[in-house]
């Protein structure tokens, strides 16, 4: 599912989504190490147990974060794509693309982490105005139009939703 959201509202939308207690575990992807740390910090401030893994963390810190996530001491793992490579997580409820990947194949790798071993899993993506081009490239690669969630409290006001009438240029 795709959530169109203004960049400044992504943080609030993520907290809103994670308030659903039926989500036992979530893997949140960012494009950068700095972004992963930032997301982890604001989730922790919102009393959502989160840890970040990325290339600037020691191997020991990454392994501890992963262990805490697998045993559900940590509910949310925030990761960059490189750090998440090779990670095997069973029973992952939700993958959240907090930032749309700029490489379409990366999207496929990210969403492939949910619903393994015949279990239910879901992937959602937050798309702001600057990420629309990445979304187009992803949809072209997978040949699927990703369903849009058009009712949420932080719906973007400046991103045209597919099928909406286009504004005429003066």
Regions found by a protein language model. Name each.
Residues 162-170:
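Intrinsically disordered, Lys/Arg-rich low-complexity segments
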Residues 1-160:
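Conserved helicase RecA-like core
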């Amino acid at each position: 599912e795709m959530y169109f959201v203004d960049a400044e509202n992504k943080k609030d939308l993520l907290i809103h989504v994670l308030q659903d207690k039926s989500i036992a575990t979530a893997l949140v992807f960012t494009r950068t190490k700095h972004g992963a740390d930032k997301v982890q910090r604001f989730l922790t401030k919102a009393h959502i147990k989160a840890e970040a893994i990325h290339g600037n963390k020691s191997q020991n810190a990454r392994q501890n974060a992963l262990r805490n996530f697998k045993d559900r001491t940590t509910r949310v793992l925030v990761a960059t794509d490189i750090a998440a490579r090779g990670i095997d997580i069973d029973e992952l409820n939700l993958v959240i693309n907090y930032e749309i990947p700029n490489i379409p194949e990366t999207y496929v790798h990210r969403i492939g982490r949910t619903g393994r071993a015949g279990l239910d899993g879901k992937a959602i993506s937050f798309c702001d105005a600057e990420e629309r081009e990445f979304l187009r490239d992803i949809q072209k690669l997978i040949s699927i139009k990703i369903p849009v969630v058009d009712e949420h409290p932080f719906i973007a006001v400046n991103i045209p939703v597919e099928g909406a009438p286009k504004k005429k240029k003066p």
